[in-house]
């Protein structure tokens, strides 16, 4: 049996999930009765809540992790309709991307991750989600996952998207849309980072171009790139790239 996730202060959790830039902003929202947890208004920003609790912010969507905001930014920027789509989420982790897809109307999401027990209960229990834990995309059976997919999204760490690009056609059909989070810190050389952060914009741009080239070699045509609406760990600037499978 998995242990229940440790409770956190609400204001810390809201900042961690990318809902607010700092604790002061989160506090103001709580005091203004703009935050509900499990459908109940919270009176104190210091209240302890579960990381997988249903948190609602007045006037905007909320996701189980800050990754959802990144993908939502891409869907908005690329005018990407997800309604009715069969989707693959590579590196699902807590489920931020999957949550975003479900809220956007996806018919089904195959949530794949090499780890176990990270997916939020809200996502895990959704009938539209098929969970594939302890599963590496390099070894996954496309048919078992439900390929071909209409949309593939990916958010992984400690490995570059460029190195994974040759795998994506196995899960695609002509017209499959790909949206990937490019993390320059995992695409660049070690000596191009400063304590894990890529500070040189030229290096960051180069990594995006290299991912685009790898996707092109795999049969995808890149249609757009944006800077992520929120930064990654330690302030890393990240990017989202959209491509369409042509072959």
Regions inferred by a protein language model and the residue ranges of each:
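S-adenosyl-L-methionine
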Residues: 110-163
